[in-house]
From Swiss-Prot:
NDH-1 shuttles electrons from NADH, via FMN and iron-sulfur (Fe-S) centers, to quinones in the respiratory chain. The immediate electron acceptor for the enzyme in this species is believed to be ubiquinone. Couples the redox reaction to proton translocation (for every two electrons transferred, four hydrogen ions are translocated across the cytoplasmic membrane), and thus conserves the redox energy in a proton gradient. This subunit may bind ubiquinone. NDH-1 is composed of 14 different subunits. Subunits NuoA, H, J, K, L, M, N constitute the membrane sector of the complex. It is a multi-pass membrane protein. It comes from Rickettsia bellii (strain RML369-C). It is found in: Cell inner membrane. Its EC number is 7.1.1.-. This is NADH-quinone oxidoreductase subunit H. GO terms for biological process: aerobic respiration. It catalyses: a quinone + NADH + 5 H(+)(in) = a quinol + NAD(+) + 4 H(+)(out). It comes from the Bacteria. The gene is nuoH. GO terms for cellular component: plasma membrane.
Length: 339
């Protein structure tokens, strides 16, 4: 009986504890990211932001959570009730399970699988289904139009994202995210320089993937009232809200892993190695999240034709050209990784 416990049950308990250890801090980070967003945008607009609930407004996310929890969940009469309830759950769950393959520090990763890049691409592609289901199940023209916009936007920018990731795979020679980070430790500086434009393209693409300004057309308030979640209230709205911000943190972690060295120090200086890798990872992700908030506070929304033109006529040809360029340079300089 004891052997059965240690062989089958104990590993499941360890996995459950690891999942809880990632999920709870992540939900707290999402809650306080909303607070940080309101404070940062307030400062940029020369106002205070939330500062009443608790010292410096630090209890504002808890007040918002309690408010949403006790609101009445309203389901439209003609809505598909089962899908209407499932849609926000799908969005929120998919935003969490992508973290399984993200390396927080050396050896600190929930599932260190050899196809981590394919896993993360699959999860990011599936995340749009929650929005599409919400738009269709709501039986509202505004919600449905927001869902259609979201699917078109995802298709347009997922292609460019995939090609950008191919350039990273060409230089590192692996689909394992931990190995991608370690490969950047010894990567020549000129390869890093060559990947910089693709890092910018990737970051702009994930802005579109997460429906953030200037690409928030699926929930454009001035056109679609609130877009795909116009009919949601209470915890349904809260789960969409949490899913959006959890996706922001996830794509920032992906950008950090692919282009900023993950948990590695920013410079190859010996004394920087004394600082734990987790600190560098959090610092880089925090910087990218600040860029998300900065962009929201300063840039206007794109028109829909501008959004499509940027994805298909600018990013797609540019990333295709860069894949050929990186391949040619690596072959010419004999720097193709030994796979």
């Amino acid at each position: 009986m004891i052997e059965l416990f240690f062989e089958y049950i104990f590993p499941l308990i360890i996995i459950a504890l690891k999942v809880v250890a990632i999920t709870i801090p992540l939900i707290l980070c999402v809650a306080y990211l909303t607070y940080a967003e309101r404070r940062v945008i307030g400062l940029m607009q020369l106002r205070r932001g939330p500062n009443v609930v608790g010292p410096f407004g630090l209890l504002q996310p808890i007040a918002d959570a309690v408010k949403l929890l006790f609101k009445e969940p309203i389901i439209p009469t003609n809505a598909d009730k089962i899908l209407f309830v499932l849609a926000p759950m799908i969005t929120f769950i998919l935003s969490l399970i992508g973290w399984a393959v993200i390396p927080f520090a050396k050896g600190v990763v929930l599932a260190d699988i050899n196809v981590g890049v394919l896993y993360i691409l699959a999860i990011s592609s599936l995340s749009v289904y929650g929005i599409i289901i919400a738009g269709w199940a709501s039986n509202s023209k505004y919600a449905f139009l927001g869902a259609i916009r979201s699917s078109a936007q995802m298709i347009s920018y997922e292609v460019s994202m995939g090609l950008v990731i191919i350039t990273v795979l060409l230089t590192t020679g692996t689909l394992n995210l931990s190995q991608i980070v370690e490969a950047q430790r010894t990567m020549p500086w000129w390869i890093d320089l060559m990947l910089m434009p693709m890092g910018v393209v990737f970051f702009i693409s994930v802005l579109a993937e997460t429906n953030r300004l200037p690409f928030d057309l699926p929930e454009a308030e001035s056109e679609l009232v609130a877009g795909y979640n116009v009919e949601y209230s209470s915890m349904g709205f809260a789960l969409f809200f949490l899913g959006e911000y959890a996706n922001m943190i996830l794509v920032s972690a992906m950008t950090t892993t692919f282009f900023l060295g993950g948990y590695l120090p920013p410079f190859n200086i010996s004394w920087l190695d004394c600082i734990p890798g987790f600190f560098w990872f959090v610092f880089k992700v925090g910087f990218l999240l600040f860029c998300f908030l900065w962009i929201r506070a300063t840039l206007p929304r794109y028109r829909y034709d501008q959004l499509m033109r940027l994805g298909w006529k600018v990013f797609l040809p540019l990333t295709l050209f860069w894949v050929v360029l990186v391949s040619s340079v690596l072959i010419y300089t004999d720097h193709l990784p030994n796979v």
